Amino acid sequence: MSGLYSFELAGLDGKLIRGDCATGKDRQVLFITGFLSKRWGNKSKALAQWCEEQGWGFCCYDVRGFGESEGRFTDYTLSDWLADARAVLDLLKHGPPFTIVGNSLGSWIAWFMAQEFDVVDRLVLIAPAFNMMGVRAKQITFSVKMKVVVILHSLTTIVHSSTSVQRT
């Protein structure tokens, strides 16, 4: 991906959150990984390539305690990973509007971020972990529901092949 740059942000405990971004125009896409997934898995690679073809920005990161970010995995909780997502969005919020693509646990985090950041105007949730939210899932406001596209089990709008990314 051209124009890719790496970033480091200090988490609330001073440990570094590491990620990568590519600039683009009109829209930015933030990919939030699922539980125990590193930022450059197959989904994020395919999505990054597709964003580049659209001329959109793309960003992905590793939560503290996993991947290339600092810290021990066992020292962090969901609250910490929500804070990591806030830090990344704070870094990027002054650019074009955001679509957050969340995978599994990342969908749960994305849902919270969409409520906190006005720059997030679209969500794509892959196998969202809403069962973790209990009663909160029932309290999703209509305006947030209008942002959400739920995709169960697979990302059907982007198919990664060895030669290209195609829309289906």
Q: What residues fall within each predicted segment?
A:
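Short beta-strand element of the alpha/beta-hydrolase
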Residues: 26-34
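The alpha/beta-hydrolase serine catalytic core
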Residues: 108, 118-168
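Short substrate-entry loop that stabilizes the transition state in hydrolases
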Residues: 36-42
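Catalytic nucleophile-loop/oxyanion-hole region of alpha/beta-hydrolase
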Residues: 67-92
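Conserved alpha/beta-hydrolase
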Residues: 44-70
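Gly/Ala-rich beta-loop-alpha elbow adjacent to hydrolase catalytic centers
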Residues: 102-110
